[in-house]
Amino acid sequence: LFRSNRLTPAVLAYEGIAFQYMAPSVFEIQQFEYLQNHLRILSAFYGILKPMDGVTPYRLEMQAKVGIGDAKNLYEYWGELLYRSVIDDSRIIINLASKEYSKCIEKYLTPQDRYITIVFCELSGDKLVTKGTYAKMARGEMVRFIAENNIENPAEIQKFDRLGYSFRSDLSSDSEYVFERKIK
């Protein structure tokens, strides 16, 4: 089915907005090593990928209806396996995934886990809203920031200040870090 000579490292294979802003093609060896040890990519087709895992192009969304065994969809098919593949001894997960993918993990969290969702928003009228394209850009940029700074302590993520975003401590909690984009 797959020829290994046609596989591309996952972190270089995806072309979505988040991956464009992550800009892995200009990473140095140290950033690739950091990502290999810390980043996990949720894939509807492959499950959990490390950045250097080889993939072949595909188009499959997590919400796709499938008939695999007793599973009616990919959420049922993957079940707890995705969670077990991302949790490590630190019990810390920094969630930069979309809601479609993060719910694959959230369902299986335990009280021992520290799960921090990163929220990117901006003021629209009198309330903060998430704008999809800008949030995707910021997710990629944040992965880049984390890798460039070799972040090991989640609190260091609060220093992220790219694309006009800054940390809002007044809106954040231990489980949710909120970053607001200031529109000029």
Each language-model region and where it sits:
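Residues forming anionic-ligand binding surfaces in small-molecule and nucleic-acid pockets
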Residues: 12-26
